[in-house]
Amino acid sequence: MKMKNVSRLLAMFLLLNAVCLIAFAQKPAKWTAPDKYKTMKNPNAADVSTGKDLFAKHCKSCHGKDGLGDGPKAATLGVSCGDFTSKEFQSQTDGEIFYKMTTGRDKMPAFGKTITEDNDRWAIVSYLRKLK
């Protein structure tokens, strides 16, 4: 009788482990912006200086001073912070970047709540374009 209980317990443990491995091994869903943002144009494209200052204040701790995703907080998050110099990132429209910065997701804060002026978030988008 004891051996039967041990076998059941072991089987349940192995099943639970398999479920956890599958759940954590999956890549996060692709982060897409709604269509209306994909065509948005940056009304503040020339304001790179303000964007640089705001990036240093709000983004650098995770994304690093050069936008490589290697800021001091990045290692503690358990997820990639992304590389703003990458072709993949730079291929997004300004509106897509603006949307993601504004709404956030998972460990990425929703900066629409802390950087409340749209023009300031657009200025950060302008600065991010210079990181190519």
Placement of each model-derived feature along the sequence:
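Bacterial N-terminal signal peptides that target proteins for export
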Residues: 2-14
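C-terminal segment of classical bacterial N-terminal signal peptides
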Residues: 16-24
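Electrostatic cytochrome c docking/interface patches
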Residues: 27-54
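Gly/Gly-Pro-rich "capping" loops immediately C-terminal to redox-active cysteine motifs
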Residues: 41, 48, 52, 64, ...
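The canonical Cys-X-X-Cys-His
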Residues: 51, 55-65, 124-128
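Conserved functional loop/turn residues at catalytic and ligand-binding sites
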Residues: 58, 63-66, 88, 104-105, ...
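Axial heme c-ligation environment in periplasmic c-type cytochrome domains
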Residues: 75-82, 96, 100-131
